[in-house]
Amino acid sequence: MNSPIAVIGGTGRVGRLVTRRLLDRGEAVRVVGRSAERGRELPEQAQFFLGDVREPETLRIPLRGCSAIIYTVEPGTDPAGPDSPESTVHTGVRNALAAAWGGAVPPQFVLVSQRYVTRRDHPMNAYGRMLDWRLAGEDAVRMSGLPYTVVRPSWLTDLEEDSRITLEQGDRRDGYVSRRDVAEACVQALYCPSARGVTFEMRSEPGSGPADWEPLFARLRTDEPAREAGARQLLAPVADRAIA
């Protein structure tokens, strides 16, 4: 790509893998994170910016002029804590979307969410309403007007083996997927036209990985068009608030 790619949460477990894959492709990468110490552990080719998704003013400079943004922030589970699901995967997403509109050309936005977000009775929702807030963050992305991809991984593992990847929709099944494969999906979404405007779940099984991701994305249904009314309102930086 001709412009930098920002990885928000790029010092986290998935974010670091995304960063390395982009660098391997020769991309200019801006990593946004809260820990200067962890930032020093990044490859020297990556440009680190100290930023916090809960503080909109810290996002404007690192996101300015980026051709794409990959949001890999990992939430906490305490609803009253500083890394609550609300503040990281809803408010933080909205703040990043608002900052993303600062350039002349709207960037592509890739959001790492999770499977089960439409199942409010799933046990994961007991942790600070994790699933409710993730779904609200997804909705903000879909309503933003930016070109986007929403990735919903299954249970995450650290396996390094090559895997057969399944992309699916409907949020009905279960499964596992490695962080390695999630990172690859995020990166591939930037280069595959069929990945635009889709939300999908992913899981992996023993087998060979895809040689070409475009056919996998091409089998997915695009999301219903977002309503224009109210879309811009969703782009304003926000303080935490409750979901009705």
Task: Go through each PLM region and give its residues.
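NAD(P)H-binding glycine-rich loop region in Rossmannoid oxidoreductase-like domains
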Residues: 31-101
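Glycine/proline-rich active-site loop of Rossmann-fold NAD(P)-dependent oxidoreductases
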Residues: 160-165, 189-198, 213
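C-terminal tail/cap regions
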Residues: 198-244
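Substrate-positioning beta->alpha
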Residues: 93, 173-188, 198
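Non-catalytic, hydrophobic alpha-helical segments
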Residues: 14, 69, 141, 151, ...
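Structural motif
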Residues: 4, 67-68, 108
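Glycine-/Pro-rich loop/turn segments that contact NAD(P) or position catalytic residues
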Residues: 75-174
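N-terminal Rossmann NAD(P)H-binding glycine-rich loop of SDR-like oxidoreductase domains
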Residues: 3-27
